[in-house]
């Protein structure tokens, strides 16, 4: 059995196994743990009462967190004409069509979000094998294929998160950075859960939000007492 590092031992001493934590208590405790050598994110995992093997129970959406994620988001937009001007005015880092596709084929993929207007999908369709595995392929279900590219850019820059249930029916997403105020972090999580409830599949039975776990990038996951959340 591998020995625990000094950091892991310090963390283990502060965590109470089997406990469900009040949200603010969990956020404060995680922020107080020995830090990694970079600014960690707060991440949340939500176990949902769905069967992701059934297509009508795959939960997938996007929502703008009220306080963002603390991350600088680079956005590329496939569009042309007046929409291209609107995307640039909204803060897009790169806007184009065939020339942008050529750049991406050449390996320039330093973007966090890729957005496309419907008329640009003839170009974007060539990039499926490049963008798909990286989770960057535009999709109307999460608002990244839209005629209103300017609003999509603003949402991405404002801290919109995209999520989809994994094979175990769990969604994972970042909800802030270590320096976030606990109240703002809580409001971000509440907004996420409210959005999950909004798109609950009609065929989902029983308890829908089964468990909420808060963690930091390199830290442990703490189960949250859902009664401490207003969602």
UniProtKB/Swiss-Prot annotation:
GO terms for molecular function: rRNA binding; structural constituent of ribosome; tRNA binding. Transmembrane segments: none annotated. The keyword Lyase does not apply. The keyword Cell membrane does not apply. It comes from the Bacteria. InterPro entries: Ribosom_uL1_bac-type, Ribosomal_uL1, Ribosomal_uL1-like, Ribosomal_uL1/biogenesis, Ribosomal_uL1_3-a/b-sand, Ribosomal_uL1_CS. Pfam families: Ribosomal_L1 (PF00687). One of its GO terms (biological process) is regulation of translation. Keywords: Repressor, Ribonucleoprotein, Ribosomal protein, RNA-binding, rRNA-binding, Translation regulation, tRNA-binding. GO terms for cellular component: cytosolic large ribosomal subunit. CDD domains: Ribosomal_L1. PANTHER family: 54S RIBOSOMAL PROTEIN L1, MITOCHONDRIAL, LARGE RIBOSOMAL SUBUNIT PROTEIN UL1M. HAMAP family: Ribosomal_uL1_B. Belongs to the universal ribosomal protein uL1 family. Part of the 50S ribosomal subunit. Binds directly to 23S rRNA. The L1 stalk is quite mobile in the ribosome, and is involved in E site tRNA release. Protein L1 is also a translational repressor protein, it controls the translation of the L11 operon by binding to its mRNA. This is Large ribosomal subunit protein uL1. It comes from Pseudomonas fluorescens (strain Pf0-1).
